[in-house]
């Protein structure tokens, strides 16, 4: 079983190849409005390194936002193309879940990914004994919104931590029609 994981919703370009529950290739690269220049060459680099083709993957997981309009379109276009042309099942996940998947310790977590003009993409969740409880689902709010929380680890653009092996299968959504798939732009308060 091989899985391709992609997300370009923020300044972070994330790619992971998972084979039999082991990450065999991973790229976590910060960029500024240049994911379209790097995504396909980095995927190709991983394929060449492991002597694979996209046909060798059984599943694609795509972070669908919320996030930057152009950034979301980059990985979404690639994932949809691979899924449609090669008949590979495509699953979506909130980018906020994916970009915070490396946080596993007990505690409260406040995702605060910078949007524009004083706003953030936010999610609040608590982890207790390995179980994740969502307190507030994906939101587009003012930067000061999370000040209402007296405690919690703030996850921002500076400390995104992805662990593609820690993706909760319950957070995945199978895409029935790749042509109808749209990013989660989340632009309303």
Where are each of the predicted segments found?
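N-terminal phosphate-binding loop and adjacent alpha-helix
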Residues: 32-48
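Phosphate-handling active-site elements
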Residues: 50-55, 84-95
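Oxyanion-binding and handling regions
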Residues: 1-22, 34, 91-189
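Short glycine-rich phosphate-binding loop at a beta-alpha junction
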Residues: 55-64, 150-158
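Phosphate/pyrophosphate-binding loops at sites that engage ATP/ADP/AMP, CoA/4′-phosphopantetheine
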Residues: 43-59
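DPxDG-like acidic metal-binding loop motif
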Residues: 59-90
